[in-house]
């Protein structure tokens, strides 16, 4: 995983302490669009925690509504597509990429994924709902086989999006 912000990398490292040490290659600070070029097709799992508008976290950070404006969305979506494409390139055949945002905005979630997939024949969607169910403490009420969109009023979380993609070749 690559991150430009060292403080976010530290948060990810803390979260990964719950995972067996031999299951994690590491957290790298850098630009995910280019840093992964050195490892093309080498990772089993990659998580893209994409920079986004943060609209899904408004309940916890109401002041963030003043940090973004609608004109920011196209540039963020372009960056998200670049990061997702680079992550897929860095993943070996059979490996998984998790694309995650804390935004429910379609331009930052499904449309980004759909756009990237339209240009690739080596990737398929995986069942994100089953993956979430396998680690959930209680039944989250998700539709099987789909991307996952969590909502504050339904799931008691931020509005987060997850798509799982499998590299087929």
PLM segments and residue spans:
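S-adenosylmethionine
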Residues: 1-169
